[in-house]
């Protein structure tokens, strides 16, 4: 559960936000932020996964009782890891995290497909993009 103090800070933030978290709290912080955006703010969004395959992220979110139907995923891991890729309406698979052009195109398509005014774009890791 996101703390009252952190919730207040999130509410006060501007339209564009970059948050950083320490490694030991990374997984929990990601889930708390997605839960906050989908349940309290009630915004749909795009989740760009650069560290874990879509199926793993989807399972983690569902285990935390997060409705993944309001999230479009961009998976830049599964192909690189040799995982099985099946066409899924809510997930766009990208060749690798290093393919920034494909990630950018996929983000544009995903964000454009969300008709709501308020939406979020979430990267599970920016460090991976620096490789």
Would you name each region that the model predicts?
Residues 5, 64-94:
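Nucleotide-state-sensitive switch-loop elements of NTP-binding domains
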Residues 46, 72, 120-122:
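A structural signal for isolated positions on well-ordered beta-strands in alpha/beta enzyme cores
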Residues 49-51, 75, 123:
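Short beta-strand/turn micro-motifs composed of small residues
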């Amino acid at each position: 559960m996101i703390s009252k103090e952190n919730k207040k800070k999130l509410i006060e933030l501007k339209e564009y936000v970059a948050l950083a978290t320490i490694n030991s709290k990374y997984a929990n912080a990601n889930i708390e932020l997605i839960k906050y955006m989908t349940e309290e703010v009630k915004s749909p969004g795009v989740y760009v996964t650069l560290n874990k395959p879509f199926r793993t992220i989807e399972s983690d979110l569902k285990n935390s009782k997060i409705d993944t139907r309001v999230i479009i995923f961009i998976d830049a891991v599964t192909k690189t890891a040799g995982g099985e890729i099946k066409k899924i309406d809510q997930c766009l698979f990208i060749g690798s995290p290093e393919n920034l052009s494909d990630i950018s195109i996929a983000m544009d398509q995903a964000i454009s497909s969300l008709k709501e005014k308020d939406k979020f774009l979430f990267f599970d890791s920016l460090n991976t993009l620096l490789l």
